[in-house]
Amino acid sequence: MANFQLTQEQIADYGRDGYIIVRNFLTQGEIDKLYKIAVGDDSISKHAFDLNDQTGKKTRLTLWYNPGNDAYGLLTRSKRIVDSVDRLLDGSSPVCHFHSKLMQKEPRVGGAWEWHQDYGYWYKNEFLFPDEMISVMVAITEANRANGCLQVIKGTHKMGRVEHGFSGEQVGASQHYVDLALKTMPLVYVELAPGDALFFHSNLLHRSEANLSEKARWSLISCYNRQDNIGYNEPNGSHKVPVKIVPDEALMEWETSGVMDSSGFLEKDKDQALK
């Protein structure tokens, strides 16, 4: 989407609901390029790891901290994303890229994600200001109810941080407060076409069910932070490094390949939020 800029209505919707959906945020050509890399890149597969849900089903993901000049790095550094994030976050210090993860829910075996807030994880990293943190999900393939699309509880970002504990290998929100939220606020299934984007607050309660369909669900989730919001228990310094913004056209016009080995991939046993 060339020269994209959020409207005042979208910014207000984010403040009220804790999320916004932007349809056709990426072109079909951009999605085709990203999908080809996702399924064929050695670095992505080599650094992938599984997290078990409560039933033992596995969700596979690859997470990295440092966006480079590869296709995924150029997307996360693109003007359309970073400028949008800058307008949605509280504060005024520079926007930094915390990390990106490629979510890989394979047909029939891709596991669920339990109800949680992203800040439920990041609180353990000792970030202090959840209003200065945001996630941006881009659908690489279609996301629908059948293949375990994201579910959100609208407006729950205003509840503040909910207590979290372990649910399988994941960090899950207190079921009591989830039940209270579901009695009070609407549940929304976030069904996305390839190229659609979801911007959501770090305290928005969300989950996804297992993929029991015949089709894979792939998505990129990039997380951003204001430079002045220090993660005192976060060993990687990416969250304090301002994003070097590139033009939106870079994804298609610059010579790119798969995710670079210098991207700083996470090793599962070193994730502070899982301890």
Question: Where are the predicted features?
Answer:
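Short edge-strand/loop segments of extracellular domains
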Residues: 104-107, 153-160, 217, 223-229
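Short, charged/polar surface micro-motifs in flexible loops or helix N-caps
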Residues: 81, 107-110, 143-145, 158, ...
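Short, surface-exposed loop/helix-turn segments at secondary-structure junctions
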Residues: 59, 117-120, 170-184, 216, ...
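Double-stranded beta-helix
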Residues: 143-205
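Non-heme Fe(II)/2-oxoglutarate
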Residues: 44, 48-50, 54, 84, ...
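Short, conserved beta-strand element in jelly-roll/cupin
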Residues: 123-145, 191-192, 223-226
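Generic beta-strand structural signal
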Residues: 93-100, 111-113, 132-138, 148, ...
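Non-heme Fe(II)-dependent double-stranded beta-helix
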Residues: 2-17, 22-126, 165, 235, ...
